[in-house]
Design a protein with these regions (language model features):
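Class I S-adenosyl-L-methionine-dependent methyltransferase catalytic core
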Residues: 1-216
Length: 216
């Protein structure tokens, strides 16, 4: 089973370098578990993955050390302050969150279409950027900070997108909400990545994604 929004390969060596001193890392919204490919770039710690949709992990074979299936806002399997680091890529609140079923044969790059059925309640993959999306990510980040050790490292890969010709400030939201929850923002790395070449805004794409780096 394919996932419509796996990590771009260009991020993996960057993550591996940032995480090199961490004994373990959690990806709470792991999708297929591709984060485990940081081991190919020198990371030697334990990789723990969690996702609300259990089927994603069946689509690829990555060297994940431990899998969990739960809402990232309620990871009751994890202890307080259990993880040295968290590295994740939340949904971007873009048109990949469209939740209708296409019957006209056109290509649809959405979580719903790739998974093949309705998403689990609480999955941000059906949330367009707005109040529901923002409230849910605040809950998720509160839970992430609960399971992250004091002075632990938090890495968030996220991007703005274009809607009706306007750039939506998704990156700024994630930066602000984590700061409001008590995380210390350290720096942002902007990385040019290939973007989708079709769709309503195919001629207007944000050309970079951001890696936001925080300490608890």
């Amino acid at each position: 089973m394919q996932h419509p929004a796996k990590y771009s390969n260009v991020f993996l060596p960057i993550f591996a370098d940032l995480l090199k001193d961490c004994g373990n890392v959690l990806d709470p919204m792991a999708g297929t578990g591709k984060i485990a490919k940081i081991k190919e770039f020198g990371y030697s710690g334990k990789v723990v993955c969690n996702d609300i949709e259990s089927e994603w992990k069946n689509g690829e074979e990555y060297a994940v050390d431990e899998w969990h299936n739960s809402d990232a806002a309620n990871m009751d399997w994890a202890n307080d302050c259990e993880f040295d680091s968290i590295c994740t890529s939340p949904t971007y609140g873009n048109r990949m969150a469209d939740n209708f079923v296409s019957k006209d044969g056109t290509r649809r790059i959405t979580y719903r279409h790739y998974l093949g059925h309705e998403l689990q309640e609480g999955n941000t993959g059906y949330m367009q950027f707005g109040k529901k999306y923002c409230d849910k990510h605040k809950e998720i980040y509160s839970e992430c900070l609960r399971v992250l050790k004091p002075n632990g490292l938090m890495i968030v890969n996220v991007s703005n997108h274009i809607r009706a010709g306007v750039e939506i400030p998704v990156v700024e939201f994630h930066k602000n909400v984590l700061t409001e929850l008590g995380a210390k923002f350290e720096r942002e790395i902007k990385v040019k990545t290939p973007r989708m070449g079709y769709g309503a805004n195919s001629k207007q794409r944000v050309d970079t994604e951001s890696i936001l780096i925080f300490k608890k």
